[in-house]
Structures are given as structure tokens and as C-alpha cells.
């Protein structure tokens, strides 16, 4: 994607909606530095007077290869080629959380060469940008979200060394035959078929229900409507158990089913994986904002480059979705998911 601005302007645009996401003053400060060519070290400091319980899953604290940074080569954003999640918003296990005590600093490291192509090498601008989902100390349910933006740094990356890291990462992606059998096959097939119905209803509603378009996508412009309709039509085409561009798996393929993850997608490989939590969920639901098997499939399908190539922004659930900008909503997997569920239920 071509940008006419550098990283500072890009991050300002992305953060415009994210900045209002914090309903409380949650004092987490993120700083990054680059070491060993393409390794990023991040420190997250709680400068407040009380502990904060944040969701690790899908965030900069996650050990999996989720999107943790924005990288620019001049005016071009370097494409992210890692994992996109669907994360549960309620009933998360203790392992999904990180408690950051008052005054404590948590340090994490990740290698951006694993999920970005730096083969040509050169100078890059890097910053960490995202959200932390927050829960009460005695709860496994997400109740708010906090946006963060780190310092911006310039780094010179050796393409040859970065390519070695990337080759090692790609070698871990071992493709196997589909393992969806028995009840898991039945559940997955039913969910895919139901996903198609969800998408078809949503595509129709996007053209006629301006109130819902405003509520979820914050726009009723012809451009926004066209984007939403096109995306849902592509979802409907992809939600086909015997066709489509993606491969569906019922067991973890790359070790990414961490606590709280319902399913994940590797867009560059057109792989979608349903994690164990997926198979404990209902196929569908008449609850307004329920997480179900069918809308999980819909969520993951939007991540496919053939459909929309959406992002998560580590923003899950209605409360967080409402605080994004229109531009973010139009490229946000859970916005499409929540819209489709609302249209189905009529809420």
C-alpha cells in the first residue's frame, strides 16, 4: 500500500481514533529499541499507583507472531506477514493475562524480520502501535481498552541477515492434510455454511440500513457502503465448505492457539485454524454480541487478502469497536463480525 506520508503522519492518522479508546487514565508507557539488526526490545511501564491486568493474547506481550509494530520504508508501509487472531472477550483464562504492578516494567522482545520482508535491506522507521485490553483484577472478561503508541525509531537493517531470520520462520509453517474429522468436521462445516448466510444478510443490510452503517462503520457514504458490501459478498463466496481460497484446519498448525485464542489466520498462506475453544462454542446465537462459531469463521475470513485483508488492532468486542475511526472500522475484522451478528439478531 502506497502512502504519501512518513511514519509520524501515518501513526497520527491511525492513532486518531485509538487515542479516545481509553475510558480511564491507564498509565502504561511503551518504549522500543532495535538490537541485533532486526530484533525489537519493548519495555512496558506502569507509572500509575495501582496494578493493571491486561490481556497478553494478541498484544505486544504475546509470544506469537502477531502484529506488534508499524514499519515504514520511506513512504511505503512494509507489509505484515504473520498471524491474525480472533480472541475471546469473556471467560478468558488466567494464562491470557499479564498483571503489571504499579511501578513495574515488563520487557519483551520480538524479531520483526520474522513477519516482514527486509530482503532488500536499508533504512526503516519503526514504532509500536496498538491497544491493551483490560480486565478487572478478579475477572476474565474484557471491560475496556487502552491505546498506546511507542517512541519512533530509525533503524538500518541488513537484508541478508534479516532474510535468514525470515527463512527460519517460514520453515516452521509445515502444511498438513486437513484434519477436520468427526464432530469437528460437522461443526466446522455447519459454521462455514452459517457464515455464508450471515454475510449475505449483512451485504443486503449495508445497502439499506443507514442506522447500522453509522453505528458500526460510522459512515453511509457510497464509498463506505461499497467497501462493506463488496467485503461481505467476498465473505459469502469464501464461506463454502467445498471451495474458496483458504484451507481450514481443526488443530493448531504453528503453535498459535494460546490461551484466549478462538481461531487464527495466516493470510499469506490462506490458512485458517480453529483452536480448541472454537469447538466449545455454539454454532450460532440470537444474542446480540455473542461470539459463535459462524461469526468466528466470518471474522477470520475477513483477514484473507483475497477478501479484505483486515486488521485486528488488538481491538475486540463492541465497546472497543465503537471507539475506532471510520477508516479503522472499514478495515477491522471484529467490526464486520459484530455488524453481521447485529443484522442477524436485529439488535
From Swiss-Prot:
Disulfide bonds join 180-250, 257-275. Coiled coil: none annotated. It comes from the Eukaryota. Keywords: Cleavage on pair of basic residues, Disulfide bond, Hydrolase, Metal-binding, Metalloprotease, Protease, Secreted, Signal, Zinc, Zymogen. GO terms for cellular component: extracellular region. InterPro entries: Fungal_M35_metalloproteases (IPR050414), Lys_MEP (IPR029463), MetalloPept_cat_dom_sf (IPR024079), Peptidase_M35 (IPR001384). Belongs to the peptidase M35 family. This is Neutral protease 2 homolog MGG_10927. It comes from Pyricularia oryzae (strain 70-15 / ATCC MYA-4617 / FGSC 8958) (Rice blast fungus).
Amino acid at each position: 500500500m502506497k502512502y504519501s506520508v512518513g511514519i509520524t503522519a501515518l501513526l497520527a492518522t491511525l492513532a486518531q481514533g485509538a487515542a479516545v479508546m481509553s475510558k480511564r487514565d491507564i498509565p502504561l508507557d511503551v518504549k522500543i529499541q532495535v538490537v541485533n539488526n532486526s530484533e525489537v526490545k519493548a519495555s512496558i511501564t506502569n507509572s500509575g499507583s495501582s496494578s493493571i491486568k491486561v490481556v497478553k493474547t494478541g498484544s505486544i506481550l504475546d509470544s506469537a507472531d502477531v502484529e506488534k509494530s508499524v514499519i515504514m520504508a520511506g513512504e511505503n508501509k512494509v507489509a505484515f506477514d504473520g498471524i491474525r487472531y480472533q480472541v475471546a472477550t469473556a471467560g478468558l483464562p488466567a494464562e491470557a493475562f499479564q498483571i503489571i504492578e504499579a511501578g513495574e516494567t515488563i520487557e519483551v522482545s520480538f524479531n520483526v524480520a520474522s513477519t516482514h520482508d527486509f530482503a532488500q535491506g536499508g533504512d526503516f522507521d519503526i514504532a509500536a502501535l496498538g491497544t491493551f485490553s483490560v480486565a478487572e483484577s478478579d475477572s476474565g472478561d474484557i471491560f475496556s481498552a487502552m491505546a498506546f503508541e511507542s517512541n519512533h525509531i530509525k533503524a538500518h537493517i541488513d537484508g541478508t541477515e534479516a532474510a535468514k531470520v525470515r527463512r527460519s520462520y517460514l520453515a516452521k509453517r509445515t502444511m498438513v492434510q486437513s484434519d477436520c474429522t468427526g464432530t469437528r468436521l460437522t461443526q466446522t462445516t455447519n459454521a462455514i455454511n452459517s457464515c455464508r448466510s450471515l454475510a449475505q444478510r449483512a451485504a443486503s443490510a449495508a445497502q439499506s440500513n443507514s442506522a447500522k452503517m453509522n453505528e458500526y462503520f460510522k459512515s453511509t457514504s457510497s464509498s463506505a457502503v461499497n467497501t462493506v458490501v463488496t467485503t461481505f459478498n467476498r465473505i459469502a463466496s469464501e464461506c463454502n465448505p467445498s471451495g474458496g481460497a483458504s484451507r481450514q484446519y481443526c488443530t493448531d498448525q504453528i503453535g498459535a492457539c494460546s490461551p484466549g485464542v478462538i481461531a487464527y489466520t495466516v493470510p499469506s498462506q490462506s490458512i485458517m485454524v480453529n483452536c480448541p475453544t472454537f469447538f466449545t462454542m455454539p454454532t450460532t446465537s440470537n444474542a446480540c454480541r455473542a461470539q459463535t462459531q459462524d461469526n468466528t469463521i466470518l471474522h477470520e475470513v475477513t483477514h484473507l487478502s483475497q477478501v479484505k485483508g483486515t486488521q485486528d488492532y488488538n481491538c475486540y468486542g463492541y465497546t472497543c469497536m465503537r471507539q475506532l475511526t471510520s477508516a479503522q472500522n472499514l478495515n477491522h475484522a471484529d467490526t464486520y463480525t459484530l455488524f453481521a451478528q447485529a443484522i442477524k439478531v436485529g439488535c
